[in-house]
Amino acid sequence: NNGKLVVSEEGRYLKHENGTPFFWLGETGWLLPERLNRDEAEYYLEQCKRRGYNVIQVQTLNNVPSMNIYGQYSMIDGYNFKNINQKGVYGYWDHMDYIIRTAAKKGQYIGMVCIWGSPVNRGEMTVEQAKAYGKFLAERYKDEPNIIWFIGGDIRGDVKTAEWEALATSIKAIDKNHLMTFHPRGRTTSATWFNNAPWLDFNMFQSGHRRYGQRFGDGDYPIEENTEEDNWRFVERSMAMEPMKPVIDGEPIYEEIPHGLHDENELLWKD
């Protein structure tokens, strides 16, 4: 009822078209399109609604191809989607349609990670395939009111950059009404690579899956060493850049995650 999501004039936050500020309270339902059937998906989204979650972040594709609980594949002819809608078949994308529209009825946005970073890093989406996939996604979902596009997927922006750029620009060429961001690797921010990209409407970072101050993992931390909760530094760094764009912590530290996920010699909670 408040209109589509836009970036505020000064670039500090997200708001609706009518000026109402938008507070992003996200839930990571990553494998929702693959693992849940219609009834389970509706139940899950309803529970999210009751708890106040207004953005459900999902992996549209976790693999190439992905298969859902109905045994339907996301691709039946590679990245050629011409015949993806088969008569009499409740296909992979029909189920995705259902999830998106069910969320819309509940006042929720779907943060669509177009494809997770792992298959792209393995070379399973070329630049030309990214263009074809982006065109398919944009044409199918440009008129849905509750889409937020996520490029990337737990991956650094300097890995397969050309593929991510091709995916983003092919979507934006068709769909200019939905916001778009880049979901980066833990303890990195999209501002490092894409702040000046015209397709990036707002930045995103992850707090990471380790203790603040734990220095074991990929070894790349674009912030000062600190043993305190320091995810605010990613906000500070991102918003110091020009042009200023809003920034979201797309994955704060999770509850019930192992105590120091990336170091097998560290303690972990097993209770």
Give the role of each language-model region.
Residues D249-D271:
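Aromatic/acidic polysaccharide-binding cleft in carbohydrate-active enzymes
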Residues N1-K4, E10:
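Contiguous, structured surface segment used for ligand recognition
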Residues E10-Q214, Y221-E229, R233:
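Active-site mouth of glycoside hydrolases
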Residues A173-T181, M241-E251, P258-H259:
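Short beta-strand/loop segments at the ligand-binding rim of alpha/beta enzyme cores
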Residues N196-A197, A240-E242:
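Short, conserved loop/helix-junction motifs that constitute active-site signature segments
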Residues V235-M239:
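FAD-binding beta-loop-beta segment adjacent to the flavin cofactor pocket
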